[in-house]
A protein has these predicted regions:
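Short hydrophobic/aromatic segments of transmembrane alpha-helices and their interfaces
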Residues: 9, 49, 212-214
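A generic, residue-level signal for flexible/boundary positions that often mark functional hotspots
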Residues: 14, 59, 216-218
Length: 236
């Protein structure tokens, strides 16, 4: 009987802790979305691209969305251009500032197609881990994103390559980690102002994908099905 009472008390305490955690947002534990790790690993496991010294060099900088369509772009331009994606996932502008010069290397790039935004606008904990809680801050708020992107553009312009900025692709409600659908348009608007001021060509993947999300994008996910990645590649 004593053990039974003790067990009841333990259950009551645990229940109270769970309820308190839920009220304070701690119950929204991060669940990684399908696609990002999978696409990044797939890219890393691919054989190095064979370089044709007589063909122009094209660098694609971006996150897992661009990793998803780079292979299709490479197929489309086979025999016409060397298409390279930056190693791994370019993630947000903070990582971009840290690694851009390394990604550029000493290659003479003819075209650089780039994007940042999807990781900047996602919500993270104070320690920087992905969060499903919209009350948590964004990885880079709009002001920080704007400042970072301006500096990245400055560095990219120094390469003398033809620059093309791809707008951040849209996504539905309920993606994990937390990204509010309306933020993609806000971050794109800030980016477009920077590109306009620097006479940089735009590739509006946001407008291309928006009316077709239900058929081309994974359910409650920022990543695209194979056909969706192919569609993006055709416009790239």
């Amino acid at each position: 009987m004593i053990l039974t009472h003790k067990r009841i008390n333990v259950i009551a305490v645990l229940t109270a802790i769970i309820m308190l955690a839920s009220q304070n947002g701690f119950a929204q534990a991060y669940v990684p979305e399908a696609g990002s790790h999978e696409l990044t690993q797939k890219q890393r496991n691919k054989k190095p691209v064979e370089i044709d010294a007589n063909s122009p060099n094209v660098l694609i900088i971006g996150d897992s969305i661009s990793i998803g369509y780079t292979g299709h772009v490479r197929s489309q331009l086979e025999g016409k251009a060397n298409v390279i994606h930056n190693p791994g996932n370019a993630e947000g502008t903070t990582l971009g500032l840290k690694n851009l010069q390394q990604w550029l290397g000493d290659t003479n790039w003819d075209v650089i197609h780039f994007n940042w935004g999807l990781h900047d606008l996602k919500h993270v904990t104070e320690s920087g881990k992905n969060s499903n809680n919209p009350a948590d801050p964004q990885q880079a708020d709009l002001a920080t994103y704007t400042a970072n992107l301006k500096e990245l553009v400055k560095q990219l312009k120094a390469t003398d390559a033809k620059l093309i900025f791809a707008t951040t692709t849209p996504y539905p409600k309920g993606v994990k980690p937390c990204r509010l659908p309306e933020d993609a348009a806000k971050y794109n608007a800030a980016a477009l102002n920077i590109m306009k001021a620097n006479n940089i060509q735009l590739n509006d993947l946001y407008s291309l994908a928006l009316p077709k999300l239900k058929t081309l994008q994974r359910r409650r996910n920022v990543h695209f099905e194979k056909e969706g990645s192919k569609l993006l590649a055709e416009q790239v």
